[in-house]
Structures are given as structure tokens and as C-alpha cells.
Regions:
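Sec-dependent signal peptide recognition
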Residues: 1-7
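Hydrophobic h-region of N-terminal signal peptides that target proteins for export
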Residues: 7-16
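Acidic, metal/ion-coordinating pockets
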Residues: 17-241
Length: 241
């Protein structure tokens, strides 16, 4: 899914002038970057979505524009990037990584479906990427996800602003992915990881922190939130920790 462009307006610390940083996010691409008909928009007369080629052209033009205007640009992906189409599955994600390298992504976080070909495959894909794979809540002491391009977070300096990007994997991965594909990977609850890493990121100089995740929102979010509040009231969760 290609998302719209967001712009972050920050106040410059030196002259008080606004700093503009453009943010592009994608998620759940599932290897679908070819031209296609948008039947979900109009089943009878579906418009054409030009896909990955048009997106690449758009990003190229935006890079020129932002550089000309003295603005920053950040491109992030929220995971589930290759499973779900023949293009993505034929080589277990390598073509998608090549396309993402061409776009110039700054970082991505793996989604649950990115483990469909196993943790070893995901580790190998990360070595081919020109951008880091981020996760902060996977316990990976004995799993294959151990190369130098896999990190809990990064801090990028853009237009004088230190932007921290923290990767958080959906903790339900333990329920939806076969144990043999996880290869010993265990997931910590998202909130505990976020609370643990943000102080470290701030002490490392992050002025602004972005949580990059494919956790989504549960369909029964009202019930889940009510259960969360009940656990706090029973002392099962320390909301101050």
C-alpha cells in the first residue's frame, strides 16, 4: 500500500525558522508493485494504479524538489513487503529488495508475513538491502537475524534534526508464524520494548522519535482496550514503568 506524503514542520533551533521534512510511508506492499486496476475504488469502472514504476518516478521528482527547497525527505516501510504475489514470492523477496533499494528507502520494519520463508531468508534479504531492517522487541540470541544491517533503531540527521526511528514487530508473530520459520525468535510486547528503548534513543541525541511498526489495530480494539485497563486496575500492568 502506497501512502500519502506527510510533511513535518519543525522549529529551527538557531534562527527560529521552520524546518520541513517530508515523510513517505508504505506498508503491506505484498510484492504488488505492477500496474493494476483499482476495483476497490470503482468495481464497474476501476481506475488504473500505475504501481512501483510511477512511485519511483514520483520519489525521484520529490528528491529533486526537496533538495532544491532545502527540505528533508524520509522514506519508511512498515513491513509485509514481499509475500502475497508471484513477483514477491518467486525469489523470496529479492526483487522487492532491489526495487526498494532503487526507491531509496531509509528503513523498514519486518511484518509477520515477511517470515513466511523463514528467519534465515529474512536475514539474507537484509544483507542485500541498502537500508536497515529495524526491530527492537525480538529476542534473537539463537536465531539467524544477527547481521550488522539489523538494528533496534537508527538516528538520522536530516536538515539539522536528529530523527530516531524505532522498529517494533507485531508481537503476535509468535501465534501466526510457524516455529520453524522463526528459528528461535521470541517477541516481547510492543509497549515494553517502546518504554525500554525510547530513553536510550533520547540519551543518544534523538530530537524526534518515530515508531515504525506493522502492529496495526485489532478489530476488537474497544474490547482489547477495556481488558488493558482492567489489567492495570488489577496491578498486572504497571503503567508507570
Amino acid at each position: 500500500m502506497f501512502h500519502f506524503l506527510f510533511s513535518l514542520l519543525l522549529l529551527g533551533s538557531i534562527h527560529g525558522e521552520p524546518i520541513k521534512i517530508n515523510l513517505i510511508t508504505t506498508n503491506d506492499l505484498h510484492g504488488v508493485i505492477g500496474k493494476q486496476k483499482a476495483n476497490f475504488m470503482n468495481p464497474q469502472y476501476p481506475p488504473t494504479i500505475l504501481g512501483g514504476a510511477a512511485f519511483a518516478k514520483y520519489v525521484d521528482e520529490l528528491k529533486i524538489e526537496t533538495e532544491k527547497n532545502g527540505e528533508g525527505l524520509l522514506i519508511l516501510d512498515g513491513g509485509n513487503f514481499f509475500q502475497g504475489s508471484p513477483l514477491g514470492l518467486v525469489d523470496n523477496g529479492y526483487t522487492m529488495i532491489e526495487w526498494m533499494n532503487r526507491i531509496g528507502y531509509d528503513a523498514m520494519v519486518p511484518g509477520i508475513y515477511d517470515f513466511i520463508s523463514g528467519a534465515e531468508n529474512l536475514n539474507e534479504l537484509s544483507t542485500k538491502a541498502t537500508f536497515p531492517f529495524l526491530y527492537s522487541n525480538l529476542d534473537c540470541n539463537n536465531c539467524p537475524l544477527i547481521n550488522s544491517n539489523i538494528k533496534p533503531y537508527i538516528i538520522k540527521e536530516i536538515e539539522g534534526v536528529s530523527i530516531g526511528i524505532l522498529g517494533v514487530v507485531n508481537s503476535q508473530i509468535m501465534e501466526f508464524v510457524l516455529a520453524e520459520n522463526l528459528s528461535g525468535t521470541n517477541a516481547e510486547k510492543e509497549v515494553y520494548s517502546i518504554r525500554g528503548w525510547i530513553p536510550d534513543m533520547k540519551s543518544s541525541g534523538a530530537d524526534l522519535i518515530i515508531i515504525l511498526t506493522s502492529s496495526g489495530v485489532p478489530w476488537n480494539r474497544e474490547d482489547e482496550y477495556e481488558m488493558f485497563l482492567q489489567k492495570i486496575s488489577r496491578g498486572e500492568i504497571d503503567e508507570t514503568s
